A protein has these predicted regions:
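Beta-strand-rich ligand- or partner-binding modules
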Residues: 1-188
Length: 188
């Protein structure tokens, strides 16, 4: 047995539905830093403990940050809904020694293929936010958001506790903007 704390802790939130597309404001969080004076002693709150936090945010237009695929007749992949993917049979990869090109994989059309990040409807994870109150670095006008936090410590007897995390947001200023162009001689 040993004493001490893990050097890294990771938290990933569930998807957060904002109810409608919004503009994001600041990311606020409360991190407490602790240090244990030594073996068998209770940790105490210490602001100077070498504990860091990196909080990343991503935003999306739909309720899944993943895209699901099944195999086609010619071995390619086609995107399907999560429900269609879950109904498809799992991939059973069979290795054959006697194929035209010296062996390979037999894949059956309709089987589950890859699950990838949905880069069409979801942003990449933002650059890390290291201080509370920073402006959120994720695209606005999105309805869904997800947060992940990494709390790291350089010493075995220090750790951090994330007490709260909140996202400032506001309604969109306009859902759509329409402009008209007319010749100066023919105003409308």
């Amino acid at each position: 047995f040993g004493e001490g704390f893990l050097p890294e802790t990771r938290f990933v939130s569930h998807l957060i539905d904002m109810g409608e597309p919004v503009n994001f404001g600041r990311l606020l969080f409360d991190l407490e830093r602790y240090r244990s004076p030594g073996f068998g002693q209770n940790p105490v709150l210490e602001d100077g403990a070498t504990v860091n936090i990196d909080v990343e945010v991503r935003s999306g237009r739909d309720d899944t940050p993943l895209s699901h695929h099944i195999y086609t007749d010619i071995g390619g992949e086609i995107e399907v809904t999560e429900q269609q993917y879950n109904r498809a049979p799992p991939t059973m990869v069979l290795f054959t020694e006697f194929r035209q090109f010296g062996g390979g994989l037999n894949i059956i059309a309709g089987q589950q293929a890859s699950i990838k990040d949905d880069l069409t409807n979801w942003s990449f994870w933002s650059a890390p936010h290291t201080s509370s109150g920073e402006a959120i670095q994720a695209p606005d006008a999105r309805q869904f958001v997800q947060v992940r936090a990494f709390i790291t410590s350089e010493e075995v007897f220090t750790f951090g506790r994330l007490n709260s995390l909140s996202i400032e947001f506001s309604p969109l200023l306009a859902n759509s903007v329409v402009g008209e162009v007319a010749r100066m001689e023919e105003p409308q």
